[in-house]
Amino acid sequence: MKKYRMVFILCLFFSFFCPFMVCAKEFVSAKEGLDVMFVMDYSGSMKTNDSRDIARGMVKAFVDTVHSADIRVGFVAYNDRILTFTSPLAIQTEEERADLKKLIDQEQYAGNTDIGLGLSYGLELLEEEAVRKRVIVLISDGEPDLEGSNTGRTTEISKEDLKLAAEKCTENGIQIYSIAFGDYDGNTEVLKSISESTSAQMYSAETPERLIEVLYGIFGTNMDYSIQKITDGVFAHGIQNFHVGLEENYTDEMDVLLISPEKIGNVSIFYDGQELPTANHGNYVVGKIIEPDNEIRELDIRTETLESQELQLYLIS
């Protein structure tokens, strides 16, 4: 499967802006057969760190844009209880992705934090299959805290369960990638320790928008894809136009992803003179190009921004 490389980017803006252009790091892998289990903190403190629900939006954006030929995604939402869950599911069709995203949106942030419970439950949902790699992505904004919880569990029990789950993952070759989210409450050494014990890594995502880059960074050695950041800027009110030049061959799918902490306005994506359908989910917008034509070397993207609106634009293939 051949890759493409961006050779030039010409951004034409009809209003003044202050861009922070960032060169994308490209990740390529030929791994196959991957089961990913997201274990995500839905405790009350997440209301402060993610007041606009962008963090779970970035998990949904990952589901919408990851190339899904041989990947299955599971999900556990926890606070001091297990709120929602599913074992790894195929996400090849729009309907499959919609079902998983509906589950992610089902509960609100509330309650205490029982990381040990969430991680243990996520591990139980990962079925062992010899031909598939298994990975857990643990997202939390703080250490276990069950003070005032009426579940009968204590912070000490949660920490012990966290340790035991990490040991089981090590024994079974399951990596735990942990993400310290937002203004992390506590010592991140706990997350770092359990990740490193499974030959994985801990990441920090200080802002919700940063989470998508962390997620794609985690899977750089587990999946066959490339991600490139086209722009990362603060824009004035008005219409913004991005003209992207491409060369060499593409893969069999290319995704355009726009992200903003504020609601994104109308987005138009033009490829080969045709406007592509887009899905606007508020804080992120996705446009898909299925089986790109190798002869087409241009892509145009148009969107409307508010005054001082932050906007990130990515190409994923």
Residue spans of the language-model regions?
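VWA/integrin I-like adhesion module and closely mimicked acidic/polar interface patches used
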Residues: 50, 106-107, 112, 117, ...
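Sec-dependent signal peptide cleavage junction
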Residues: 18-30
